[in-house]
Amino acid sequence: MGRMDYLAMKTDDVDTVALVNSDMEELKVAAKKLFSDVSKLGGLGFGVSFLKFLASFAAIYLLILDRTNWKTKMLTSLLIPYIFLSLPSVIFNFLSGDVGKWIAFVAVVLRLFFPKHFPDWLEMPGSLILLLVVSPHFLAHHIRGTWIGTVISLFIGCYLLQEHIRASGGFRNSFTQPRGVSNTLGIILLLVYPVWALIVRVM
């Protein structure tokens, strides 16, 4: 009887060890899967942030081009709301704070009392700073960074692209004319960010 009890206890110990080992293996598999998913999501998030920076600078680049001899017929004023919606949070918070308020104040004073000293090329940047400073909380925190703002950015990019292609005389000319290539590439960069952001959001 004692031998049977001993064998039963030994069998129970073996079963317990096997069960613990099995649980440990499952934990290892779960940890590896969690690490893989976190790495994947982190990479996707980094991609969105990087493309957001790229899109914002592309929009600023197009604004600068519009004030040079490379001026196009497209409605570049739409780049202002695009920059507002796609500007990275770090830069947005900096420009919508006291720094932006001082810049906006100086711009308004110059425009009102010294119009001759207020160059035309400052109209767009001044409008952007004013928009960043006076935008309501709802627009700044509930439209920016959400799928609504991303969709609006996508529509702006698509509209600017089709307007640019039409002004260039066709799709081929937009890539072959010296003045058209730089604008075309800039607008394509405007489209990459919202498209990728929507894909990541769906995933």
From Swiss-Prot:
Signal peptide: none annotated. Residues 1-43, 96-98, 142-144, 201-203 are extracellular. Pfam families: WCOR413. Residues 65-74, 120, 166-179 are cytoplasmic. Keywords: Cell membrane, Membrane, Transmembrane, Transmembrane helix. It is a multi-pass membrane protein. It is found in: Cell membrane. It comes from the Eukaryota. The chain crosses the membrane at residues 44-64, 75-95, 99-119, 121-141, 145-165, 180-200. GO terms for cellular component: plant-type vacuole; plasma membrane. InterPro entries: COR413. Belongs to the Cold-regulated 413 protein family. PANTHER family: COLD-REGULATED 413 PLASMA MEMBRANE PROTEIN 2. This is Cold-regulated 413 plasma membrane protein 2.
